[in-house]
């Protein structure tokens, strides 16, 4: 279910940014470097508009290890409970989780 929400969100973003109303599934694949760049650029654009502005907001970039971890987490997602922090730690850094 969470993957469906993710794909629908990505489809809406990509549809708006490309100015098209028809997309193939291949146009949404996050394994495509062009799609990765489009997602990252849109995310960084949105982050720049926060008010008040962040004092030390770093530019976000694509990370294949984190992307793969997020994919695994989404596949085993239980929307009623959070994943333990140990399951959301990559390279010693904890990753956030949002369940809605």
Curated annotation (Swiss-Prot):
SCP domain span: 41-81
Regions that span the bilayer: none
Keyword tags: Calcium channel impairing toxin, Disulfide bond, Ion channel impairing toxin, Neurotoxin, Potassium channel impairing toxin, Secreted, Signal, Toxin
Cellular compartments annotated: Secreted
Post-translational modification: Contains 8 disulfide bonds.
Gene3D superfamilies in the record: CAP
GO cellular component: extracellular region
Entries under InterPro entries matching the protein: CAP_dom, CAP_sf
Leader sequence segment: 1-22
Tissue: Expressed by the venom gland.
Keyword NAD: no
GO molecular function, one term: calcium channel regulator activity
Residues forming coiled coils: none
Job of this protein: Blocks ryanodine receptors, and potassium channels.
Family in the record: Belongs to the CRISP family.
Name recorded for this polypeptide: Cysteine-rich venom protein VAR1
